[in-house]
Amino acid sequence: RHGKDLNFIGVILTNENVFLVDKERSSDMVAKLIEFLGVDGVLVTEEGYGNPDTDLMMNCRKCSEVGANVVLITDEFPGKDGKSQSIADATKEADAVVSCGQGNLVVHFPAMEKIIGTLDYVEMMIGGYKGCLNEDGSMDAELQIIIASTIANGYNHLTARYY
């Protein structure tokens, strides 16, 4: 659709800082560039969760404030029961969100015939937990144990739906 009803302007890469002052500075620069370019719409993604959710929401809010329509593309982590707030930060401007799936979903992984490496650290990995390894060699763990399983760039077919 580029050149017909949409014009792709480009990609803005920004970092996800640890300190609040750096987060503010980075998101200020993103919004300033969006305003300078006269962009009507923005897709904002993030990598990670928790602390990076603040960067996501700051970018959303500030791009909205300079007049851009914003759609967030992110994964969610609402806890094993699915009832917790799925993103660690929020802003009222975040009113259009595409979910790439939820990383806390517990998945059953059948036993493998051959294992390369060790299972010694599975229970300590993100997504693993004490007791996730079963006696028959299978495993029940959160989806996020598979690195990039819910990557917020949308390279998968996972989604979270609200009914």
Model regions and ranges:
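Anaerobic metallocofactor- and corrinoid-dependent redox/one-carbon enzyme cores
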Residues: 1-163
